[in-house]
Amino acid sequence: MSIGFDRDLYIKMQSRHINERREQIGGKLYLEMGGKLFDDMHASRVLPGFTPDNKIAMLTELKDELEILVAINAKDLERKKTRADLDISYEEDVLRLIDVFRELGFLAEHVVLTQLEDDNYQALTFKQRLERLGLKVAVHRVIPGYPTDARRIVSEDGFGINEYVETTRNLVVVTAPGPGSGKLATCLSQIYGDHQRGIKSGYAKFETFPIWNLPLEHPVNLAYEAATADLDDINIIDPFHLAAYDTKATSYNRDVEVFPLLKTMLEMLSGSSPYKSPTDMGVNMVGSAIIDDAACQEAARQEIVRRYFKALVDERREEQDDTISARIAIVMSKAGCTVEDRRVVARALDVEESTGAPGCAIELNDGRLVTGKTSELLGCSAAMVLNALKELAGIDRSVDLLSPESIEPIQSLKTQHLGSRNPRLHTDEVLIALSVSAANSETARRALDELKNLRGCDVHTTTILGSVDEGIFRNLGVLVTSEPKYQRKALYRKR
């Protein structure tokens, strides 16, 4: 895939622009970080050249001048919400985030529990856990009338009931495990607390998507709409920016809806607002670092199709209606893409049709397509991985990397001792067997050395993957989709 984004140019421009905003504010700046600070896989998929750690690398330029505050919604703790991309709970992700920030040399010692109510026992337990770990925890309550009653919100009965976070640096980055965590309210509550203490402070937003200086229906912006289809977010033209500057800028519904209130709050807190529009609040320079628009458009279309398949599978797993996939289908239509644009889909379905059993296909980074079929020894995903490694290593397809003699003892262990009904090897078992074989086989060693070249490849399977295969593909960095059907009929399914 062609590079479409200049990582180094972005880091340089973005850090400079944040400093310019700090000078404009002239005091403490609370910077709300939308999206993922690191592990930003979505951005890396739709902007080829953007690395998952791009934003944190940019902030490293400002490391000695900032501190990081993590917000988490108490209701998300009660719901045991998880990060789907990492398959960990928000609770654990807060700890993971702080660990990574500290390993990179950032000051991170504060957590804000937002929208806490007295019966949020899970959140209260988590608060105690954080405090035992030496972290400072501030509690923000549910404020009646938020976010519409500005006069009450900006008062002792509003933000005044929240605990104030004593920050020590003039750039405070507010981040969270996911959307809806209360980052904006945390920033505004802190500005209120600063105002009560005579401290000058302001607010800015760093949201990667939608990209304000790309057209409303640019595929990169549409890919963001597909990614947030479960939140019912939509991209819109910023009406305030258009009125103030007679210039079109892309924003999204929640920012536009909250802007009048935000502007009013800033005026009540500091006498005036520096912003005429939601776009003005942002400091995003991502659009200015795109160097190949066509490459980014194609990458974004592929991401939209992947999101569509993910929605179909999620709806099948959870036995939900097709609301989210239907929304993404509309986005696909706007972007001018279909499932046929994902080349691996047709090839995987061809394998299933010709064999009468589940099939799998992968598109290598040079465009070659490799398939895998279900056999008595291997599941189709495991077979596909072996075939792809052989293709990459230049090993003839007829060569067996694993002998039946090495596979059969593993099958016996699974079915006779570990209670598995399925004797076929999963991808993890195949890779372990291949690693063992590599000790004595030059051919197996050559194949294993190609494992790193699967990263970023597209895969499609004709049945919903089990958790093991799904986890292995995630760890390998493979972009996998599935047809929304199971291999066998059953009511109970292990996850």
UniProtKB/Swiss-Prot annotation:
It comes from the Bacteria. It holds the Pfam family DUF1846_C. Disulfide bonds: none annotated. InterPro entries: DUF1846, DUF1846_C, DUF1846_N. Belongs to the UPF0371 family. NCBIfam families: PRK13663.1. This is UPF0371 protein cgR_2887. It comes from Corynebacterium glutamicum (strain R).
